[in-house]
Amino acid sequence: MLMTPGPTAVPEPVRDAMSRELINPDVDPRFREIYDRLTDRLAAVYGVDPSGSGNAGGSGGVGGSEDAARDVVALGGEGILGLEAAVASLVEPGTEVLCLSNGLYGEGFADFVESYGGEATLVAADSDEPLPLDALDEALAADEKDFDVATMVHCETPTGTLNDIGSALDRIAAADAEVLTVVDAVSSLGGVPVPTDRIDVCLGASQKCFSAPPGLATAAVSDRAWAAMEARDPHSLYTNFLPFRDVSDGFPYTHLTTEVVALDAALGLLLDEGLDAVRERHEAAAARCRERGAELGLETVPDPERSSPTVTAFEAPGRAAEIQERLREERDVILATGLGEDAGDVLRVGHMGHNARVDRVDETMDALADVL
């Protein structure tokens, strides 16, 4: 049983959709119909007006950094493509970017910024701490910096931390309303409410809470972010959102047919269930996972109140790889270890998407109890 925090188990209706006749996305009009339906469904999950999903260059939606439209796009590539594409589309030499971080992916934004010639200011806390909001205020108030873009992560998957991005967005807007905001919501979107209407580029991916296979990076993009992209020379062809804003004359490259069909089907299941019901299911699964973990003497990496409804990271100092291997070999349950410096000390349970069910969590924790 696959219980990692992405990729997740893919439900049978999605697998069935993937097995149907393969169509050519470059010449078959049916593909455009599927892609349009996919972006409409994505818009519903993002919480923006489907009429503004941008497939023909349209705009509209519930308000951009509170008042602009949001267009929704889906690029062919894993979720990291979205992070790099956001930077590649907005950053050029000299662009000042504030990277707010308390984990691996927050720091990764700074690496992307520097690789495209931007000036990254990393405002960071330790991976088991909240976002450093006081340090954010200090950075925003510093006279020597005039930030163009700010980046942050909603759910730091390696530590299972759900960040208070609302407070960070408030402080950025109060300090300088012109700063464009980029948020990695890859492991929260679909399982946790995300304030997309306050974010200029909100990033998602197919293999997390949507429970489709890896292969698509999604984004909801504001009008002012599009304007910033159009005002600069492109520094990349593939990692570039702009060609996807208007696909009325075709896609910039051959799209990933099977992945588009799969995500469309997965989003259909999610919306049929209802966003509120899906989020309640994630909360219930997370609560059961932590309750069962506490019974086994396991502690979460962040404080429980900062743990994400989509993933639980348990402390397992020096034992994570051993426990992971025994679970796989003895019980056919697959969990993830930590990443980076925490790789050997953290064991992660992904209760997101199709896996956000109490019965699946109970089966997982029963297996974990047997090997501890």
Put a short name on every predicted segment.
Residues M1-G54, G58, G63-V73:
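A glycine-/small-polar-enriched, mobile loop at the entrance of the PLP active site in fold-type I
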Residues T39-D40, A69-C99, Y105-A110:
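Conserved beta-loop-alpha segment that forms the PLP phosphate-binding cup at the N-terminus of a helix
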Residues S89-D146:
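PLP-dependent aminotransferase-like
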Residues L131-V186:
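Active-site phosphate-binding strand-loop segment of PLP-dependent enzymes
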Residues T196-Q207:
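Conserved active-site segment immediately N-terminal to the catalytic lysine
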Residues E299-E330:
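Conserved PLP-binding catalytic core of the aspartate aminotransferase-like
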